């Protein structure tokens, strides 16, 4: 199985990813999140005003890990870079993630502006 095939298998429900970004002071910030793949990119969905989005706008480098939660474990560790972000379709993408991971509709909180962040993997390490 090719590395990208394993990324596609793991980067989606029910597997939760852990995204590492760099804070303004250089310290790491790690956040668990839901994710999906599209055209050899990894997409995450977040809200305007979050620490992770501010970090990504300042420094687009990321590290991401996802594991299958099995023993022996299958996992990927990915280094990549943000190649774009958009508000267009972000609410729909959020709905898709909620349905896939939780089986419910996204809460659509008042004033919450969603953003799709597109990550291009530069290095994929398959573990397991």
Tell where the protein language model's regions lie, with residue ranges.
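Charged, gly/pro-rich active-site loop segments
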Residues: 1-2, 73-128
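Extreme N-terminal tail/first-helix region
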Residues: 1-16, 72
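Structural motif corresponding to alpha-helix initiation and N-cap regions
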Residues: 4, 49-50
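Short, hydrophobic alpha-helical packing/hinge segments within bilobed ligand-binding/sensory domains
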Residues: 7, 52-53
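A generic structural signal for nonpolar/aromatic side chains embedded in well-ordered alpha-helices
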Residues: 10-11, 56, 97, 119
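Short beta-strand segments
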Residues: 14-48, 54, 62-66, 77
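A short beta-turn/loop motif at secondary-structure boundaries
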Residues: 25-27, 68-72, 110-111
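A short, polar/proline- and glycine-enriched secondary-structure boundary/capping micro-motif
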Residues: 53-59, 75, 103
